[in-house]
Amino acid sequence: MVLRTLEMQGFKSFPDKTVLNFGKGITAVVGPNGSGKSNISDAVRWVLGETSTKSLRGSKMEDVIFGGTSARKALGFAQVQLTLDNSDGTLKDRGEIVTVTRRYYRSGESEYKIDGEQVRRKDIRELFMDTGLGADGYSLVGQGKIDSIISAKNEDRRELFEEAAGISRFRHKRTDAQRRLEQAQENLVRLLDILGELESCLLYTSPSPRDRQKS
């Protein structure tokens, strides 16, 4: 799987539609401080489902939208689209070219798409699970990431190793199944309580044998 293009519009310091093309081999993005290099990696992390504003170097999600300058008005949305060469079949059940799109409005609404089809954020995260390219994957190493891994708790480091080993998908499925089971058990308890109340009402309203004889 190879990154082919990254398209940004209204994202942080990129108000206009900006398309970056990546070829085979190593690509270096260079420029002076403040030119937006870090915003490119933020765009990749964001389109893959990142929701932590701290990881995106902001205080609120609205900060990803171009905030305007003295010469330009602020925009109402931010959009990033990632195009991947999937000819090696890393992403199962997908074509040779895969596009992932995320759009966020100042109103707080979000849109996610895979190959132009509207999906949930959960679907994007599951698509890249065990590939290392997810929002929490090991392919995105920001400043200070190595130090944070070294000082991280054992549980946090284990998640990184599980992602690298390709087994995090199963852990997430197990966690989701456990959550659904707990919810089903809670619903069953509530239903039994309601059934008990209905039975009590039925006994209370049922006529006694003497009342039935009178009738």
Predicted regions and their residues:
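Gly/Lys-enriched N-terminal cap/neck module of very large, oligomeric protein machines
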Residues: 2-206
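Single conserved hydrophobic/aromatic residue that forms the stacking wall/gate
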Residues: 204-215
